UniProtKB/Swiss-Prot annotation:
Residues 322-341, 396-422 are annotated as: Disordered. Involved in the proteasome-dependent degradation of fructose-1,6-bisphosphatase. Belongs to the FYV10 family. Pfam families: CTLH (PF10607). This is Protein FYV10. Its main location: cytoplasm. Keywords: Cytoplasm, Metal-binding, Nucleus, Zinc, Zinc-finger. One of its GO terms (cellular component) is cytoplasm. GO terms for molecular function: ubiquitin protein ligase activity; zinc ion binding.
Amino acid sequence: MIKADNALLLEEPLLRVPYEMLRKNLKTVHKHMTQESTMVEQTLSKLQQSTQHVAAEYGEKQQEEARESLDQLISRVRGLKRKIATLKDEQNETLTTTKARVEHLNVIFDNEKETDPEKQKETEKKWLRTRLERLLTDYFLRQGFSETAKSFAQNRGITSLVDVTILDQCISVETSLRQRHSTAECLAWCSENRSFLRKTRSSLEFEVRLQHYVELVKSGRVEDALKYCQRFLSKNADIHLREIQQAAGLLAFPPGTEGSPYKDLYACERWNQLSRKFVQTFADVHGLSDGSSLLYTLSTGLSVLKTHSCRNFGAPAELPITADKDEDMDPSLTSSARPYARRSENLPSVFGSGFSIRMYGSDEIRGLDTLPVIPPRALANLSSMRRDIAMQNNLDLEESIEDDNEESEERTSGDGERDSDGAVPVEELEELPDAPPELLSAEYLARRIEEATKENTDIIPKTTLDMFNHFYPGCCTSHQLSRADACPVCSVELNSLAENLPYAHHIRSHLDADPVVLPNSRIFGRAKLMEYSHKMMKAAPNTVVDPTSFECFKIDELITAYPS
């Protein structure tokens, strides 16, 4: 069961944002009331002094001035009333949002007091589902999918639990800076929040005005640039003197000057820097988290799963050799294995989770550069039994081999160089009789996919593992066993997110109760590995087969793994 106190650790922005809005609203009301009340008191004081004169001395001119002053006073008071009414509506809306969020968080506290286990479990499941929907909406907004986020929030009924309006405003200003290269919206926002920027000594407004000055110089409007500098930049000389001096140097080095020391000021990258600085400042003003709450929540879970056995995806476990010269390689490698060793650091895992080929229709296949090339050492362990299974599924391997041989002869030059796609000629694999050479060709696999999708558009494999399961039945892992290698920390999507997280310290595995390490550093559950090796691969009694690389190992070589 989820602990309420632990859940609140990640929910600070949920209440922080409406709190900051209420605080800002209160300060705005106080500011307007102070300004207008001072003006009203001064006007009434002047009128009172003027009416103390004798009626005879109080002529028509003085009476007209008094009436005008009263009209202006009434107009200002009415304007103040409209402002206060608008701010009151915003306050009521924020209070409603705050109430809904407090009730949402209070559900898990009330659930701890529930005595019925089934009802308690159902309530917790519903709350977690709502939290996931909140996190997804927040992620959509931060990625710029505003319409998707709004539709999703309305459909799920969680509009009051997400900051759609605030983040939409942030995205609007950020887009104007990064894409349209316009400073108008950002300067307007800086004007509204000038007190906060002054209090935190933020340089955002100066940086935006400096960029506007740079754009004036780039467009050749030198006189306008000088006037703009004197009006807006020079008053910050006590803090940003060095930046102002550099800006003045732009007048002597127009854009396009070769070897200009001011090329960084002219660079378009400054717009991206400004947009990032604005987003950071906007988050500080409204109490938003720096990044997506979804990523923070994922990081919390990944830190629990991350162990020292998790690998960096940039260095595939099955292709550890990255030597550049033949003499630096393992002498046991065959000549056909050496090209793979040199290319290993650029290749994905053979069945690496996360690598996918996106299908854009049955006649066009893109993304084939992500196809893995299976190393010959792994192919050498493919038994003839798997070839028989493939042939029973109407895969004419011999004809395919002949086609690949002809294509290799046409593409390969007389000196034996490899063709442009990096495929090794089939002639180099004569020493591997059990290795189906067509598996080495990305073109062959692409051709088989295209033929299959033309016949049946429902056959659209999404991953490399799906392709091999479809075209080479029996050659891949079972669904149950493949889950053991689908570590979230090692996946392509989450590997970079987990890179800087600390390692967890566990004494037992929650994925497999009996994890073992193979000599190639892969980890599987012993029972699943034994069942797969003997039932699927027909391995010898004292032998196991790696389901990802098809390498064979003796049972004595297995080492019991401990997660931490």
